[in-house]
């Protein structure tokens, strides 16, 4: 897995690590029982104080992060990965603001989703309840530590964090700060725990701790996500690789399309909602492509183009390979192709998209509706940047990840997605009878 550095060197060390992870999971399960009944006022005050503590102790966080960044550079991490790793005053303030926003959101726990009174007078309600213990496996993005803690705690869950060794110092300080505040509020210190990050086995022990961990959520590159989903015996939510497309339709406004393309690709290249593919309708290619290639060049983006894109020319254009269409670059690269029609664009996305975010730029309402209906993705943007697929932009305050699967959760995962449901039945001495045939009317009962 991409979060690892080495495997345990001996069987004894492996068993020791396994017990360390399982012991943390057992403590988290106990903490989750207390968090499940914490009231909203307690949880909101906790998040506000966590936010204040992050800002107050920012120098401590930055000092630890500087060491991680220096070690990353020495280890040869690419600048895009260094950007993900880096924390500064502005990013810490952003994390704090995210916590405050989450505090201001409705508490999902106890929300009544539906209810009815049966003909026999039995009152039924389906309500939201916490998931329990949530495991998060993620790479070198220390902001995930804070986002995950804030969201899971607000939803009444305990969280086990398994970050990357590249962010170990940053994550350790962040969890220490958050835990200090948790304890100050009289909640269990084990509500937020950081697992060992130097052995891949710690991931394996976490994602197979069935009965202790209720769900595991991987956040990172394709290798990490597929490894967790394939090996987990704990239920896993697949947060997807972002092979996102921007399709410029025949009836697009060129200036609007350029603005959306540049924002989708170049605003921040190392995030999963960055555009990795550009599709251009052939009827607008002659007008749009020269300007698009020029502006992408100015933004430092290399274009991996099909034959028609290469013919359009430019110092930043190289021929695309078959692999380019399926690549999540997370860098200053984009694949680009000219398509003959909207259906051809949809077919290309079906063949190569990851189900994350797809965008169309068009002034044709019918084309927008067709694209929206036919493209299968967690989010479809009409005349808007792919960068908007984000928990903060969607009003969630933060997100635990962006799910590309269809069960339980899809798209940015906020507070409701960190809950399950429970049925409550209120009776008055009700007992179940039998059906007209003299046997239970429900085959299962």
UniProtKB/Swiss-Prot annotation:
Catalytic activity as recorded in UniProt: L-glutamate 5-semialdehyde + phosphate + NADP(+) = L-glutamyl 5-phosphate + NADPH + H(+)
EC number: 1.2.1.41
Cysteines paired by S-S bonds: none
InterPro entries: Ald_DH/histidinol_DH, Ald_DH_C, Ald_DH_N, Aldehyde_DH_dom, G-glutamylP_reductase_CS, Glu-5-SA_DH, GPR_dom
One Pfam family named in its UniProt record: Aldedh
Domain of life: Bacteria
Main EC class the enzyme belongs to: oxidoreductase
Family the entry assigns: Belongs to the gamma-glutamyl phosphate reductase family.
Designated name of the protein: Gamma-glutamyl phosphate reductase
Organism: Saccharopolyspora erythraea (strain ATCC 11635 / DSM 40517 / JCM 4748 / NBRC 13426 / NCIMB 8594 / NRRL 2338)
């Amino acid at each position: 897995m991409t979060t690892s550095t080495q495997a345990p060197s001996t069987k004894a060390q492996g068993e020791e690590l396994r017990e360390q992870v399982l012991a943390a999971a057992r403590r988290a399960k106990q903490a989750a029982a207390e968090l499940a009944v914490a009231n909203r006022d307690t949880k909101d005050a906790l998040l506000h104080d966590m936010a204040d503590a992050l800002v107050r102790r920012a120098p401590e966080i930055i000092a630890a992060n500087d060491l991680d960044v220096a070690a990353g550079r020495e280890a040869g991490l690419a600048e895009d990965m260094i950007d993900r790793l880096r924390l500064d005053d502005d990013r810490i303030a952003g994390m704090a603001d995210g916590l405050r926003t989450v505090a201001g959101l409705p508490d999902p726990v106890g929300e009544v989703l539906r209810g009815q009174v049966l003909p026999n007078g039995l009152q039924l309600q389906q309500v939201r309840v916490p998931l329990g213990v949530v495991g998060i496996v993620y790479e070198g993005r220390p902001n995930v530590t804070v986002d995950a803690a804030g969201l899971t705690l607000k939803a009444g869950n305990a969280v086990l964090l398994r970050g990357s060794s590249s962010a170990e110092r940053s994550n350790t300080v962040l969890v220490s700060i958050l835990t200090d505040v948790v304890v100050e509020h009289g909640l269990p210190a084990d509500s937020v725990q950081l697992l060992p990050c130097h052995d891949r086995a710690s991931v394996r022990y976490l994602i197979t701790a069935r009965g202790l961990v209720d769900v595991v959520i991987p956040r990172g590159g394709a290798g990490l996500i597929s490894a967790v989903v394939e090996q987990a015996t704990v239920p896993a939510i697949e947060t997807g690789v972002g092979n996102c497309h921007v399709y410029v339709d025949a009836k697009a406004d060129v200036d609007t399309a350029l603005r959306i393309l540049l924002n989708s690709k170049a605003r921040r290249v190392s995030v999963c909602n960055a555009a990795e593919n550009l599709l251009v309708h052939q009827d607008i290619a002659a007008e749009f492509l020269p300007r698009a290639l020029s502006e992408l060049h100015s933004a430092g983006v290399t274009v991996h183009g099909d034959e028609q894109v290469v013919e359009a020319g430019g110092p930043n254009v190289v021929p695309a390979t078959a692999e380019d269409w399926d690549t999540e670059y997370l860098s200053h690269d984009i694949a680009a192709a000219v398509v003959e029609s909207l259906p051809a664009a949809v077919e290309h996305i079906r063949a190569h998209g990851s189900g994350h975010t797809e965008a169309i730029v068009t002034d044709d309402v019918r084309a927008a509706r067709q694209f929206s209906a036919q493209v299968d993705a967690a989010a479809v943007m009409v005349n808007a940047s792919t960068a908007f697929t984000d928990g903060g932009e969607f009003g969630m305050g933060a997100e635990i990840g962006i799910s590309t699967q269809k069960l339980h959760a899809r798209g940015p995962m906020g507070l409701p997605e960190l809950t399950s449901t429970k049925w409550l039945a209120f009776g008055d001495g009700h007992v179940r009878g039998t059906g007209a045939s003299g046997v239970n009317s429900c085959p299962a009962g």
